[in-house]
Structures are given as structure tokens and as C-alpha cells.
Amino acid sequence: MMLSIIEYKAACKKTIIFLEEAGFILNKDEKNRIQVVEYGLDNLELIGLQLVEYINTERCCAKELVLFRRQTCPEHRHPEINGKLGKEETFRCRKGIVYLYVEGIPTLNIHAKLPIGKEHTFTVFHEIVLKPGDQYTIMPNTRHWFQAGEDGAIISEFSTKSIDEKDIYTDKEIIADCNRIVEENI
């Protein structure tokens, strides 16, 4: 199911306020291009994210990822595409706490709260806790997922070219490119 225009506008407004309260300045064009991603699961409050993409060329990409309280970006990986390595990305926490999970030795007693009914779609549990100023680089084709802490979070993402619709999700119910931009200048 897709977000309604009203839900999309509300998420965009909340995203703008969250970014501005943290000292980020968005121009009108950036505000009009906010992407709201709910993955076709109709549960944006728990599984989804909001983002502003500044640039995405053949060589680089820069975005701000906004997650509200306990919002989760589901487990996925960035595969090889047409013989080229998948996306390599660096997450830098700007606000809040981010619980990032990657392949590796599982952490006992993780901080994240798995979305009820979707527990089986999370398989990697090596925890990296990012606080403002911390960063972590995720290599291509590495399974990962992340969740904001109690106060939400802002993550600056710096990466190679982003082709989000080619990401591979552990949860087969996910629609990779669902509700990114409902309508320009809404």
C-alpha cells in the first residue's frame, strides 16, 4: 500500500522540522525533493525512513537520512550491478543515536527493538553504536540494517553511486522503490 498524499506531506513536514531544529538548512528545491520510504509495508512509523539526496552521480552520492524515534531501515545489501561493485557507503551520525547492524560476530543483548512480526527478516546482529560525530563505512554487498534511538537520528551518507531500487532486502515483502517521492511540489 502506498502512503496517501496527507501522510506523505506530514512526513515531509516533520522531516524538515527535525532537520532545521538540528541546524540543517534546506533550500526550497531540497524541501520539495524529500523522499519518504515506507517500503510498501504500510508501517512508516516503525519501518521506513526519510531522506534528502543532495547529489547522485556516476561517481558519488550524498544524502541526509532522517529516522524518527525507533524507526528502522530494514536489512538489505547493495549488490554488484552489471559487473560493477555495489554501493560503498559511509554513515556519519549527526544527531541522536543510531544502532547499526552488519555482518560479523553477533552482539548479545542488542539495543534495537525488532519490529513485531518482522523479526525473521533481520539476520545480522553485529552492533555498531553511532553517536554524533561517529562514522562507519559499509562495504559493497554487506548485509546491514539500522534503527534510530529514542530521540530519532540524522545520518549523513556519503557513498558511491546509489541505485536504491537494485538493493536486495531480506524481507521479500519489501518493495525497494516504494513512495520515494509521491509528487513534486506537493
What would you call each of these model-derived segments?
Residues 1-61, 81, 118-120, 184-186:
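A short, N-terminal "cap"/entry segment at the start of jelly-roll beta-barrel domains
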Residues 125-149:
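Conserved metal-binding segment of the jelly-roll/cupin
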Residues 68-69, 86-108, 112-115:
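Glycine- and acidic-residue-biased ligand/ion/polar-headgroup-sensing regions
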Residues 64-86, 106-107, 129-132, 140:
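Conserved short histidine dyad/triad with adjacent acidic residue
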Residues 74-75, 98-102, 157:
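Short hydrophobic/aromatic-rich beta-strand segments that constitute the beta-sheet cores
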Residues 60-62, 87-89, 152:
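Short, surface-exposed beta-edge/turn micro-motifs
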Residues 107-123, 143-186:
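Double-stranded beta-helix
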